[in-house]
UniProtKB/Swiss-Prot annotation:
The gene is ubiG. PANTHER family: METHYLTRANSFERASE, UBIQUINONE BIOSYNTHESIS O-METHYLTRANSFERASE, MITOCHONDRIAL. It comes from Burkholderia multivorans (strain ATCC 17616 / 249). Its EC number is 2.1.1.222, 2.1.1.64. This is Ubiquinone biosynthesis O-methyltransferase. GO terms for molecular function: 2-polyprenyl-6-hydroxyphenol methylase activity; 3-demethylubiquinol 3-O-methyltransferase activity; polyprenyldihydroxybenzoate methyltransferase activity. InterPro entries: SAM-dependent_MTases_sf (IPR029063), UbiG_MeTrfase (IPR010233). Keywords: Methyltransferase, S-adenosyl-L-methionine, Transferase, Ubiquinone biosynthesis.
Length: 232
């Protein structure tokens, strides 16, 4: 059985044609992308590396990593999103190999293949995030890097990421997030400990509404990033 929620897949498929509009529903991803890309590159030094973007959607991060010199493959289960990603890759001239395949399936097919594996803003949308973490750990080479980002589960994250972002500021479409699926850092750390990965760094992401920008911080109450490495 595929580790995917059909409702979640449909939700993002319906918006696929808007993925590369920096002022539409995916504006937060466009605004967030430079911050997370720089953070990933600071650890993994992407140039010349083989990278896999799990849950790549329309390819915002995938193309950005390729633009820094990585050989990138992006996977997703939304064929609509992948169609948009392919088209944008042709328009931009930045080569990314996209495939509609589950993380667990590609992990069985290509274990220990990638220098870098990213799984950003995806874990909170799947029924079993632990299985995705395990798949990412299987996919990365010994000594390689795995990066996750997700949303913490607490009152503050509910107020800001759901009520604030979806209903008040309307930065995101209503229903984008299911609070019950948010993941505490301690829970994600538990998923990581069950694999061959170890956590190198956890950073928060803070949104500054006056400047309308994201920045790294030590506040992990809402959005947070986790850098992991597989033992060499």
């Amino acid at each position: 059985m595929t580790n995917a929620d059909p409702h979640e897949l449909q939700k993002f498929s319906d918006l696929a044609h808007r993925w590369w509009d920096p002022n539409a529903e995916f504006k937060p991803l466009h605004d967030l992308n430079p911050v997370r890309l720089a953070w990933i590159d600071s650890h993994a030094h992407l140039a010349g590396k083989r990278a896999l973007d799990v849950g790549c959607g329309g390819g915002i991060l995938s193309e950005s990593m390729a633009g820094l010199g990585a050989q990138v493959k992006g996977i997703d289960l939304s064929t609509e999103a992948l169609g948009v990603a392919d088209l944008h890759s042709l328009e931009s001239g930045i080569t990314v190999d996209y495939e509609a395949i589950a993380a667990e399936a590609i992990a069985a097919r290509e274990p220990g293949t990638y220098d870098v594996v990213t799984c950003m803003e995806m874990l909170e949308h799947v029924p079993s995030p632990a299985d995705i973490v395990a798949a990412c750990a299987t996919l990365v080479k010994p000594g390689g890097w795995v990066f996750f980002s997700t949303l913490n589960r607490n009152l503050k994250s509910y107020l800001f990421a759901v009520i604030g972002a979806e209903y008040i500021a309307q930065m995101l479409p209503k229903g984008t997030h299911d609070y019950a699926r948010f993941i505490r850092p301690s829970e994600l750390a538990g998923f990581v400990r069950a694999t061959d990965l170890h956590i190198v760094e956890i950073k928060g992401i803070t949104y500054h509404p006056l400047g309308k920008r994201f920045a790294l911080s030590n506040d992990t109450d809402i959005n947070y990033l986790v850098a992991c490495r597989r033992a060499a």
